[in-house]
């Protein structure tokens, strides 16, 4: 029989546990643990000090309890991956193994709003082991993250509707664009100081497309792709909905004479809808032949560039420095090209960057700390966030897997 050190602990039998106990110097407990209570490798890993003190074991010697638990804890640290796969937290004090089932159950009733304590009272247990996690190199506790595909579908529908509504608002503001002879471009420090580069705006969209392809690859390979897509759609839709409001209420003059924008009147609602569909289907990009006027406050291109950059850097490991640097370079160069092309005022770009980054950070701060569950007011102020995130427990770990099933020939080759 192979020794315990030569065999995966999943395959340990009671005989292997007996050998391990003897090696650790616990001869007197071989009979009660292995013969009477049939402890194998997996059950040995989940052994706690409470188990040793309580029936049916009831070990009376305190020194033996402590020494045995020290040996078990060493074993748990060696086989931490096995514990995590089983959903146990091995970092709780006193060697206790706290299953995450109870945490998930508590999340359900909190998600439904049935709190058993004062909602506005002090927040407790937010720093407990079950929520400790940092994306990157640090270890994290394993949680079951339900993909909830139906919510992801709803978020996709939401963002497509918002994009369609944004396209229609862009048609409306094009009709109301101020006359260039009466309302010349507003003074702008950057635009007045930097000469226009004609090809710069096309380069902005190239930067955006590269970022989009990088994000799609990350999304495809990420284990929790459904949650990531849901968050992207909800955030992108919310920012563009705010953009609709700012575009509609105030019409800024054209930022440059090169644009040659004039108010264009569409005769009927159907013509407006047809033009809105053309903008929507072309993603509002000049590379697809879409040219718009009047949609200045704030920059939609900056929103897309910044949002994609933040999602790429958030949902990839911190050690991927090259990818993060590339993402930021594309984001910042894309913003520079927008201004260099004189397609937007500087304030358009600044406001777009600020709103996008703040909304992203606020959303993920609430999602990662679970603080919103402790306040009824948070659910009132952020209803969509509460709906989409109520069953997501803490930070989403950066885990990757191949999304497609292996072909039969590959399965035979690699087993």
From Swiss-Prot:
Major place of residence: endoplasmic reticulum
Transmembrane residue ranges: 153-173, 201-221, 232-252, 277-297, 322-342, 347-367
Catalytic activity: an N-acylsphing-4-enine + a 1,2-diacyl-sn-glycero-3-phosphoethanolamine = an N-acylsphing-4-enine 1-phosphoethanolamine + a 1,2-diacyl-sn-glycerol; an N-acylsphinganine + a 1,2-diacyl-sn-glycero-3-phosphoethanolamine = an N-acylsphinganine-1-phosphoethanolamine + a 1,2-diacyl-sn-glycerol; an N-acyl-(4R)-4-hydroxysphinganine + a 1,2-diacyl-sn-glycero-3-phosphoethanolamine = an N-acyl-(4R)-4-hydroxysphinganine-1-phosphoethanolamine + a 1,2-diacyl-sn-glycerol; N-hexadecanoylsphinganine + a 1,2-diacyl-sn-glycero-3-phosphoethanolamine = N-hexadecanoyl-sphinganine-1-phosphoethanolamine + a 1,2-diacyl-sn-glycerol
GO molecular function: ceramide cholinephosphotransferase activity; sphingomyelin synthase activity
Record topology, Cytoplasmic segments: 368-415
UniProt cross-references to InterPro entries, sorted A to Z: SAM, SAM/pointed_sf, Sphingomyelin_synth-like, Sphingomyelin_synth-like_dom
Keyword NADP: no
Gene3D superfamilies the UniProt entry points to: Transcription Factor, Ets-1 (1.10.150.50)
Gene Ontology annotations for the cellular component aspect, listed alphabetically: cytosol; endoplasmic reticulum; endoplasmic reticulum membrane; Golgi membrane; membrane; plasma membrane
List of catalytic residues: 301, 344, 348
UniProt remark on domains: The SAM domain is required to retain SMAD8 in the endoplasmic reticulum.
Family to which the UniProt record says this protein belongs: Belongs to the sphingomyelin synthase family.
Name of the protein: Sphingomyelin synthase-related protein 1
Gene: SAMD8
